[in-house]
Every structure is written in C-alpha cells, then in structure tokens.
Amino acid sequence: MIAYKQKKTKKKRVLSTGQLSTDVTTSEMGLKSINSNAILDPDYIKELVNDIRKFSHMLLYLKEAILSECFKEVIHIRLDELLRVLKSVMNKHQNLNSVDLQNAAEMLIAKVKAVNFTEVNEENKNDLFREVFSSIETLAFTFGNILTNFLMGDVGNDSLLRLPVSQESKSFESVSVESVDSSNEKGSFSPIELDSMLLKNTNSVELALSYAKTWSKYTKNIVSWVEKKLNLELESTRNIVKLAEATRTNIGLQEFMPLQSLFTNALLNDIESSHLLQQTIAALQANKFVQPLLGRKNEMEKQRKEIKELWKQEQNKMLETETALKKAKLLCMQRQDEYEKAKSSMFRAEEEHLSSSSGLVKNLNRQLEKKRRLEEEALQKVEEANELYKVCVTNVEERRNDLENTKREILTQLRKLVFQCDLTLKAVTVNLFQMQQLQAASLSSNLQSLCDSAKLYDPGQEYSEFVRATNSAEEEKVDGNVNKQLSSPPISGYGPSDSLEDVVRLPDSSNKMEEDRCSNSADITGPSFLRSWTFGMFSDSESTGGSSESRSLDSESISPGDFHRKLPRTPSSGTMSSADDLDEREPPSPSEAGPNSLGTFKKTLMSKAALTHKFRKLRSPTKCRDCEGIVVFHGVECEECLLVCHRKCLENLVIICGHQKLMGKIHLFGAEFTQVAKKEPDGIPFVLKMCASEIENRALSLQGIYRVCGNKIKTEKLCQALENGMHLVDISEFSSHDICDVLKLYLRQLPEPFILFRLYKEFIDLAVEIQHVNEEQEMKKDNPEDKKWPSSSIEISRILLKSKDLLRQLPASNFNSLHYLIVHLKRVVDHSEENKMNSRNLGVIFGPSLLRPRPTTAPITISSLADYSNQARLVEFLITYSQKIFDGSLQPQDSAVGSAGGIAPQVDPGYLPKSLLSPEERDPERSMKSLFFSSKEDIQTTDSECKSFESTPSFEESERKQNALEKCDAYLIDNKGRLLVDQELESASRKTEDACKTSKLPTLKSDREINGVERHLPRTRIRPVSLPIDRLLLLASSPTERNGRNMGNVNSDKLCKNPVFEGVNRKDSPTVVCSKFDGFDQQTLQKTREKQYEQNDHTAKTGMIVPSAFQERGVALNIRSSGDHPVSITQPSKPYTEPVRSTRQVSERRSSDSCPPASVRTPRTLQPQHWTTFYKPPAPAASGRGDEEKPVTPSVAVPPGTTHAPQEHVLKSVPGSENASAGPVHPVSRPEEKAEERDQPDVPTACQRPRLKRMQQFEDLEDEIPQFV
C-alpha cells in the first residue's frame, strides 16, 4: 500500500518549465527560487551582463600587462583586480559559485607566482608565460561554461559549492591579494635571499629563534585544540550511538507509526556515521594529524635549543675576545703613560746634571743612569703592550668572521627546519579537513535521501492501515470465538484478551498487506505487528515507554496456542515480595526481547559490553563487578551470567556477557603461574594472549610501544576487570599503552618467571657467551685481516643449540608462554622503523621480567647489577633468533600434575612416546585393570595385603623401580640420546615416592604415573626401521619361535638393568633416592648426577656388551634353547633369583585356575608376585652391531631394603617411559667402572608372597603374547 501511494505522489509532483531539480542543501534551495523568479527579471539580466563584461575586461587587462610591460608589480595588481571582480560576481550570483571556477582561479594564481621575473626578457617571455596564458584561457572557458549552464537551466549538483563563500572562509584575497611592495611579498624570495636579508640584521639569529619558539607554541595550541575537539566528538559519538540504539529499540516496538522506517533509517545512519567518525578520529589521533605534528614540534624544540646553546657559546667566545682587546688597549695606554713619565724624569735629571757643580757630579751620574734604565724598561713595556694589542685585534677579527659564518649556518639550518615544519603542518592540515569534508559529504547525502523520502509520506496513512488491521482482527476474533464454543468447552483462567491469540493466523490479504509494509521498513524487530498491538490495546504502560512487567505469568502470552513460549527467568540473587518476584521473573515479550534489549534500563547510558547483557533489577546487597563496591540501591543483574553492578557503572562496564554463570574473581596478578596455565589448553595465560593480540591488531606501528607508560588509573581498572571477567573483558576500550602496562605488570609480578630460578645461572652464562661472540665480531670488523679469520656463524650455531637445549628443560606451559611472548615481540621488532622499538630496547624492558634470580635478602652487589645487562642481552638474542630457536610448534600441555605440586616435565613433541601423544591409545591401558581385578574379592585381598606390607620395605617396590628403569633406558634410546632435565627426574622421583606410600592397588595407574606397568598392549603400529636386523627378522617369525628366542635376550636386558651391575653398565645413568632409602642425600645425588651427565654421552643404537668383569665375579651363563628345560642363570653372590618358568609349569598353573582359592592364606614372603616381576619374552641372541654375542643373564631381584648400596646404583625412572611396552628395549653399552664401585652388598633373604586369583590368567596370557615392559 505504501508503494502504491508513493507512485501516486510522484505523479502529482510536476516540475515547472524553468525549474531545476531540487535538493535539500541551502545553496540548491536558493537556486530554485532564483531560477523560477530571478532569471525572468530584466534588471537581474542587465546586472549579470555588466558583471560578466567587467570580468572579461579584467582578463584582457591582465593579458595586456603580461605582454607589454611585464613588470612584476603591475601584473600582480592586475591579477588582484581580476580576483576581486571574480569574487564579487560569485557572491552576487550564487549560481556561478562553482568548484571548477574556484580551482581554475587558484591554478592561475599558482602559475603567476611560479614565474621568475628576474629571468624574463624579450626572447623567453612567451616561453615563461605560456602556462600563464593557458591558465587564463582555462579560467575564461570555465566561466563561460558555467554561465551557459546557468542560463540554460542545466546547473548540476556536483559543480555547485555545498557551502556559500563567507568572509571567514578561504577567499581569493587571502590566497592571492598581496602588497605591491616586492620586499614584503610572501614567498617571492629565494632561500638565499632570505638568509641574506636576515644576515643584514644584527639580531637575526634571535629573531629566527624567536620565530621557531613561536611556531612551537602555535603548533602546541593547534594540537591541543584538535585533541580536545576530537575527544569531545568521540564522547559525543559514543553517546549518540547509545541513544540511537535505545531509540531504535523503543520505536521498533510500536507498530503503525508514521515515518517509522524513515526514522529507523535515520538512527541507522547516525550509528554508521558515528562509527565512521570514530574511525576518522582514531586516524587523526594516530598518524594523520596529532602524532606527526607533535613529532615535528618536538624535533623543532630540540634543534632550537641546541642552536640557541651553540649561538650563546659563540657569543661568549666573541665577548671574551673583545674583553681581551679592551684590556690590551688599556694596558697600552697605561704603558704609554709610564713611558712618558720616565722620559720626563730623565729629561729633568739631565738638566740638573748640567747645572750642578763638580762636587756633586758623581751622585748625579748615578741618578741619571738609573733613570735612563727606567726609561728603557718603560719603552720596552710599551712595545710589548702594542704587540699584545695587535694580537688581540687579530683574534677579534678572526672571531668575528667565525661568528658570521656560524650565524649564516644557524640561519640556514633554522630556515630549513621551519620549511620542514611548515610542510608537515600543511600535510596534516590537508588530512584533517579532507577527512572532515568526506564525513560531512556522506552525512549530507544521507540527509538528502531522508528529506526526499519524508516528502513522499501522506498524513494518516499508517493510521488507516492500523484501523484496517484492527477490523480484520475483530472479524477473526468473532469467528474464533464461535469455533471455540462449537468445538471445545470454555477454559477458565485466561485474561480478557485470550481470544486474540488466534489473530496470529490472518487471511491472505492481511499477510500481503504486512509483507508490503515490511518491504518498505528498514528494521522491524520481533514477530508480526498484531501481537505487539494486542498488548498495547489493553495497557497504557506500552504507550508511556514502560515494560510489560505488570502482566502475570498466566497471561495470554503463555497460552497453549502461543508458539512464542515464555520460559521462567533465572531467579535473582535478592529476596523480594511475591508481586515483585513475578514482575522480575517474567521475560519480555518476543517483540521486546532481543540481544540488545534494555528493558527498564533503556534510559541508562551503557557501554558496548553492557549492551550484551540482559539486565534486571537487583534487590539485595551484592558486590559490584566493575567498581567492587557494595551494591545496595540502584543495582542491576544480568539474567544469563548473573553479573551484578551499579547502574552508574553500566557506562564503564567492560565485561561481556558469556551467556552462562560468571565465575568468581580470580587471583591473577601475583598468582602462581601454574594456577593460571593449567586452566588453558596450551598452557599460555589468557592475559598474555589477549594483550598481545590486541597490541598486534592496532598498535604495532605506535611509537614507543612498551616504553611509554599508560594511565595508572585505567591500568588498575583493566587489571581489576581481568580478574573479574577473565576472557570476557573487552579491552578495545583501553589505550594501547594501558594494555602494554598490564602485560608488563603481569610478567613482573609472577612469583617465578617463565625462565625458572633453577635455570638462571645457565641462561646468564649463555648471555655471557653471547657477549663474547659479539665482542669477537666487533674485533673482526676492526681488524684488517678479517678475511683470514673463520666466520663466527659456528659460534652462533653452537649458542643456538645450547639455547634450544636449555629451553627444552622448561615445563611445557613455561615454554609455550615464552614462545608466544617472544614471537609477539619479534612482530613488534619487525615494525621498529615505525615504533622505534628494536630488539635491544625490548630486551631492556622484558629482561628482568623473564629472567631473574631467586629473591634473597642479601644486599645488592656490583655483580647482581651486571646481570641486568645479561638479562637484556639474552632476551634480545631470543627475539633476534626466534625463528631458529622456536620451531613454531608449541609443546603439548601436561595432562596431570605431579604429586609435589609441580607440572610433570615435558619433552619435545617429535620425540614423545606414542602413549604420551594420543590419549586414545591410553584407553587400552586403563581397560587392562579388569584383567587383574574383576571381583570385589580380589580388590579386598589386595587392599589387605597392601596394608599389611605398608610398614615393611616391599620387594614389589624394587621391581616397580626396576621396571621404570628399563622404560627410562628405552626412552633415552628412542629419543637418540636426549637427556631429560633435573626437574623431570626430581618430579618423577616424587611421583615414585607417593606411589610407594599411598597406592592401595598395586595395579596399573594413570598413564602419567611411573609406577604403573603397561602389559599386553595391542600393537597398533609397525616397529621402527631403526631396529637391528635380527629384531626385524624376529618380527617375521612365528610367535612360538619368537618366544623361544627372546627369552635370553630379555634376561640379559634385565641383568643389564639390575642395580648389581650398574657400576659396569650404567655409569652415566641419572640417579635418585626413593623415600624408602633413608641413608642418601638428595643434593649430593643431584650433583653426582650432573657430573655424570657432563662426562658421558648416551648413544642410541649401541649394542649391549657385557664386559669380562661378569665372569671375574662368578656370573655363570647357562642357556638352554629347549622349551621343556628351563633357562637357569645363577649368580653365586645373589642367590635369590626367580627362574624362568617352563611350559610344563605354565600348564600346571592353567589347571590350577579352576580350583577355588584356599580359605587359609599361606605365609607371606618377600618373593614378588609373578605379575609384578619382569616378563621374559623370547629375544634373539645376536647383537645389533656386528657379530658380537650378548651374554644373557637373568633379572636379579633386589629388594628395596638395600639402603647401603652406593648412590650411583640407585636408579630413577622417567615419566613417559611407557613406550618401552610398545617396542623392544635397546640396551646401551656402558664403560667399566672401578672395582670399588662394582662392589655390592649381599641381598637379604626374600620369602614367597601369595598371588591373587586373577594373576594366573594374566601370566598365561603373558606366555602366549610376548610383550616388553
């Protein structure tokens, strides 16, 4: 219907014959009246012709002045007159005020100014003024075209100026009208002429410096004005956006309102223009206006002060020289007076000598000689004073010449500086007004379209549609009531408007009308119009802007026929009365509710984050999440996340709604790193990722990033918000410097930095090596024999490898966080030309935060101060070589935490065992528990056994440690000699202790615990190709054959892993002490372990060779290949060994499974159960290297009670060594130790221990399917 009426309105609008198409701007509305009335006025036509004739004459006068006299003054006068006439014509006839005409006039002014009149003569006059003549013709042609279009009625909107020419705007007079005097004409002097004119002035330097200072103050005022204006505009745009959003939501709820779609479009235009203005303001504050101008101003101030200081020094030198000249002149005058006195005294003495008698001649001669000597001395002093005066005069002349040269240089430097500053000011000013003009142009076009649309509306149109829709609803209501009475009995309990529920289903005509109406609206929220007006017809709260909270829960909106079901709202944390509770619990109607529904708080200013919440009233005192104050009155609560805050805090709220209950406040800054890292899947704290990503998005080019401090109050607010909202904080509202301060504060307040305290010394030593390499590089650059020296790339590669090894010793979360931070800092360094932050600056900033020693109460020494430079140097090195040090992949996060509170150690992902990398493969391990305990009986039996042996050293513990040792060897071999760090060893030791103490079930534990023994894992992958040839051949043989051949090999492996022979075979293996070994010191063992790591190197694929020391100690090897005869291997000094069971014994045990267990338990012994001992599958006897044969020895069981064994023989297992179960154990050759290290104490007597019911089945299965433990 609206579209139909628009067509009718357009038909009624008939333009008159001479009338132009109208626009909403002021100038074009003026054109309408002029075109319709003024053009037909004869007086106006006569006046227009006179003005055009006058303008034509001025053009001719200017051309004649150029061709005839060619005097600069005359030409400028003619040009001044021409521009005055043109300006008067454009002011009098607004139709001729065109952008093209103004551009042509400016072009003419520029061409005239560009002519150098000193070079003009009769020969080159035409060449020099060719462009001037062309500009004159262009101006005349443009003026003629605009005049023709005006008279013909074809004036376009594009050619007209949007704003009329005013006295305050930039007129032609301000551009071109200048004085006739050439000495005062702006821009007519060359740089040399400017310097020469200033040199003639005695105070030229002071004047130039004064101008530079005034320029700085002027620029400061301009920048201050722009900044304050932009801040006010930014605040205004935010308020406009909030107001527009609230108004748009409110007017969208009312239907059939006049010009609703028009005002919705206007609100959308306000929001869009506000967003564009915010982007423009951000650009102007960054690199379009403020920052370049401030940078130029600071540079001007710096150079001005330097020049002023230099000029003052030169003047002081000149003053000293002039003072010396004055003193020399006074000295000359003084010496001359003394000489005159001595000369007169000599003259009087000669006269006395001539007039005296002969008796006094002798005395007079003596006096005469004395005065003559005094006269000569005075004469000599006069000559010396004259020489000094001449020297001072010469010095004064030289100094004066130097002062003039310095003066000339200073003036030249100041002139260049002023020109550069003017150029910058010009560029940023063009940016400022150009961006504002684009903003205003888009706003003008939007207003134009809105004005045209408003003219098309017919009054009363929406009211007519409302009446028509109401009549249709009434008819449908009557039909619906009749149908209900005929089909079903009346239902009580509904309000008077219950029957209007059926109005939702309208006839086709109503649907078409609704679609036609919605097609012309810009934004209509909620369901169809009838539903909103159904409530509005029976309640005045809608018309006054109130909410629908006064309706009860049993209203029409929750009737069975309503497809918009209302769900009960989440109850508030406060206590309220029954009526208020109903008001608060009722959600808004579908037309009201939405993602940005404000409800009763629509008049409250809200931030972007606050608009994401759905607030309701709060009636009980609670703590505000924004200011952390107590909310007593005027509190609000989100329905979804239950966030509580004051109404006044909604304007500054930065926590976004997560649509689920918000977690409580966490302790983030100053908290343990592991507490925050374990909550993240990759171990990287969320505050690090949020701050780094925000900085990379908008501040990589910001000058002084991470060096300039932010606002302290805003920084504290952001820290508080991160502790309250965590990932849901909107940090885009904060400045980049504030975000940088938060990141630095988090790193600085960590109790232990990313690089752990125990690795501090190693990293400091690495930094010292880096310093030595840098010094060598500098020396090689200075040395002329640099080409003969080898390149330093080898040293750098060595340092890179060492740094990689040290970083691998960090836990996974520390490594990943450090990796993430260093890569982020590398991106900052990549933009160092813009942000002025290179890797050295960032190293100085982040060095003490990432690497610091353990805090002590000792006083600060010089060596501790020297570590600051090493810390900065190390971080600089990590940033510079980040791509080589970090491979780009993060380490997997630990799935369990060690018993001591630390995170389990991590290894490189490429060398992780398969059981560590895929959790799915660990499921078969957990399922194996059913093989051991399938009934409550077994579990109870095991519990009682564990309790009875809790106070006695168990042989089972030794077996478990030995199993873990075998896994450690296999892990080291598979990883090609990669040594695990001390933290990993200590963490694994603590896990072993806790498992020995607290474990009730001696069965398999989780996949990360070291005391669990993996058994009967299905082989899901082929064996690695790095196996020896005989092992590969073994895989191709039958299971029975493998069983027969692998028995001895495994026994030899077990013997090599036995602590009895550790002195021979595992000299360089890491050691640890379990809690049962009382006589050992942890620190001593750790030092011994470090020495052993330094002395020996693990080789991956070396075959095990048992030295001749075995036979010297009485080790007897008896190997039988038959399956019916057991393999017996004995050792005289170790009598308590477990023989390998034969096939007959296996069959006997199988038959015994069917028998029920005896009611009386046999006496317990220290003999370990079979399911916990080392399994002995068949293995080839051949070695993997050459044709050497490996002696096969049994596994010698050593109980944990041997506390007097040397510390080198106490072994420690490594977490993640379960990969030994997936492949064969490759023994590693070890050098022989000393004889005293090989001496072992005797093993105490062990006794048998009863087996569980289900263990026999596992042993039988074990004999059939060989697996490696």
From Swiss-Prot:
Question: At the top level of its lineage, which domain of life is listed?
Answer: Eukaryota
What the entry lists under InterPro entries is as follows:
AH/BAR_dom_sf, C1-like_sf, F_BAR, GMIP/FCHO2-like_FCH, PE/DAG-bd, RHG29_45_N, Rho_GTPase_activation_prot, RhoGAP
Name all F-BAR domain ranges.
Answer: 192-462
Summary of subunit composition and partner proteins: Interacts with PTPN13/PTPL1. Interacts with RAP2A via its coiled coil domain. Interacts with RASIP1.
What GO terms are given for molecular function?
A: GTPase activator activity; zinc ion binding
The protein depicted here goes by the name Rho GTPase-activating protein 29
Is Transcription among this UniProt entry's keywords?
no
- ZnF region ranges: Phorbol-ester/DAG-type: 612-657
Query: Acidic residues composition bias: which ranges?
Result: 1259-1269
Q: Where is this site: Arginine finger?
A: R707
Q: Where is this region: Disordered?
A: 472-523, 540-599, 909-936, 1120-1269
State the function annotated in the UniProt record: GTPase activator for the Rho-type GTPases by converting them to an inactive GDP-bound state. Has strong activity toward RHOA, and weaker activity toward RAC1 and CDC42. May act as a specific effector of RAP2A to regulate Rho. In concert with RASIP1, suppresses RhoA signaling and dampens ROCK and MYH9 activities in endothelial cells and plays an essential role in blood vessel tubulogenesis.
Region feature Interaction with PTPN13/PTPL1, mapped onto this chain: 1266-1269
Rho-GAP domain segment(s): 671-886
One biological process term in Gene Ontology? negative regulation of small GTPase mediated signal transduction
The UniProt entry's coiled-coil ranges are: 296-418
